[in-house]
Amino acid sequence: MSSKLLALGALVGFLVLPLGTAPRADDHGQTKGEAGADRALRLKTLAPIPASKTNNTAGAMYSFDISFVDQKTETYYLADRSNAAVDVVDANTGTFTKQIAASPAFKGFTGNNATSGPNGVVAAFPWLFVTDANSRVVTIDVRNDKTVSDVSTGGAAGLRADELAYDPEHGTLLVINNADVPPFGTLISVDKTTGKLTVGKRITFDAAHGVDAQNGAEQPVWNPETNRFYLSIPQIGPTVSNGGVIRINPFSATVETTFPVQFCGPAGLALGPRQDLFIGCNMVFDTAGNVWDPNGTVPADARDVIIDAKTGKVDATVFGVGAGDEVWFNSGDGNYYATGSGSPERPLPALTAKGSTPAGVVDAKDQKLLQLFPTYNVPAVTTGSGQHPSGTSHSIAANSRNNLVFVPLPANNAVLSPDGKNNCLTGCVAVFEHSDEDAKVD
């Protein structure tokens, strides 16, 4: 098969779109060679996820959230709400190894993501930090899978703690309660010797505290060069097209500044080379600047955005990818990876249609879209004995040592590994391989 084609099981011959190398825009002083002729991402294998004894979504994985690769240990972690566990995959081989439960147990899927868990995961060996319903944050010692610390950020009853980021130098977590109104972040100190968590100051994301977040708060990221956290805010103020990225000073527990980002709905956030921030947009607007109507006549204008972390200047608008959730920068191949679970190219209507939806590969050096590759969405089943929630491909992470890319897929009978041995009937993590001729990007 041509390297430009990808067979995802029953999606035989489904076209992967390598978009080539366009003339360079601002390369931020980077002068390394252009990409090799073959940059296509290909499906390597599937890591099937077994149903746990506590699974409550028809015996398969449909509800899951953020994933993370610990680069030092080459271990992939996935917050799996269907199985009330963290799924673990060997990021060197792409094989499933185990599921980690918390004690007391994670909430699991409740019928509402805002009250479910686990949700966010970040690892710094030997500690795994995981968020849960009821504003819960735990530390798990991955040497023995024991829960060694358990705290609450103090949000409204039942609502979850969601995404989080970690400053390993100072031992500080920023944990986001996105479902509270207004949303807020909590600084939590980590005892790097014992894993013990100590809840610190709260940062409220409302107008009185510098940012009028009216539709939640999404992915935080730590920037060691500026010693600041950054956080994507989908909507600031009453206008749906106005979002932004805020810069947070963890030492004063304040929002220092807001970098406006329009026509995007910022969700995913990743720190790339040259102090760039890659923003995964979670809303599709049209070319007239309105929220895209799939039944209308105005074309969709899907995009992700790259800004300068120090100035907030928009360095590039990457058209043709999005909308999605989590994004990732892989220093091993110099690419950003962007989910596209809400892409205008996905099967519609979303509530009843299942099928492939494109994720994106973006060259961090050239700041151009290189490729779209298929992932998979599954709609909810709301009647009968097999009821389950919808599942969308909104989570992504990569291993910089071997450039394997990991995308969890909800349970389906359409996806099969290239060797025909692994399927996704109970949910899986799709493992993609990508050989890139570029050297690492600093």
Where in the sequence are the language-model features?
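Bacterial N-terminal signal peptides
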Residues: 9-18
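Bacterial N-terminal signal peptides that target proteins for export
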Residues: 1-9
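Predominantly soluble domains enriched in secretory-pathway, periplasmic, or organellar proteins
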Residues: 18-442
